[in-house]
Design a protein with these regions (language model features):
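Short acidic/glycine-enriched loop/turn segments that link adjacent beta-strands
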Residues: 21-23, 67, 111-115
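Acidic, metal-coordinating catalytic segment for phosphate/diphosphate chemistry
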Residues: 2-45
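Active-site-adjacent beta-strand/loop module that shapes the phosphate/pyrophosphate-binding cleft
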Residues: 106-129, 133, 138, 142
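Conserved hydrophobic "DFG−1" position in protein kinase catalytic cores
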Residues: 48-49, 59, 122, 139
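NUDIX/MutT-family hydrolases
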Residues: 130-161
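Conserved beta-strand segments that form the floor/walls of ligand-binding pockets within enzyme
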Residues: 9, 26, 71, 103, ...
């Protein structure tokens, strides 16, 4: 994990100081008072179901990931963006698919990456064209889809349970 060593506001060294129940990196200059809160970053994730591929679910491999690793399409929110709009935009940017319907699946803390995943089910249509962030994709029929037990896989698990329930 990258750690700040100097205050990004004033350049003073940082020291660990107990604030609000945890040790936090805090600016040594009391007049500055900058604190590294290390709060989780929200990201949107899409369980994309392709209308014109018999409802197959799209999993993608990020260009930075090793071979064989696939997960949901994810992305950051822009300032002032509604999460449901952000997921539609990310699906369009990363896969060129057009979202027809968006439904919240759930919220999933992902501690290892210090993220909060906002997971949506997205019914989509169109021709799949990946952008440079993604290396390859797989289309998996929902009845063959297997959830993984971390990160966006927990949203897949819940979505599958809802379909079968
Ligand atoms: Zn400072």
């Amino acid at each position: 994990m990258n750690r700040y060593r100097y205050c990004p506001c004033c350049g003073s060294p940082l020291e660990e100081f107990p604030i609000a129940g945890a040790l936090r990196l805090t600016c040594a200059d009391m007049r500055c008072g900058w604190v590294f809160w290390d709060n989780p970053v929200p990201i949107v994730a899409a369980i994309i179901q392709c209308e014109d591929r018999d409802g197959a679910v799209l999993l993608a491999r990020n260009a930075a990931w090793e071979e064989g690793k696939f997960a949901l399409v994810t992305g950051f929110l822009e300032r002032h963006e509604d999460p449901a709009e952000a997921v539609v935009r990310e699906v369009r940017e990363e896969t060129a698919l057009e979202a027809l319907e968006v439904a919240l699946v759930g919220l999933y803390p992902f501690e290892r990456k210090n993220e909060l995943i906002l997971a949506y089910h997205v019914r989509a249509r169109g021709e799949i064209v990946l952008n440079e962030e993604l290396a390859e994709f797989r289309l998996i029929p929902p009845d063959q889809l297997k959830a993984w037990d971390f990160g966006t896989g927990l949203a897949v698990r819940d979505w599958l349970a809802g379909r079968r329930g």
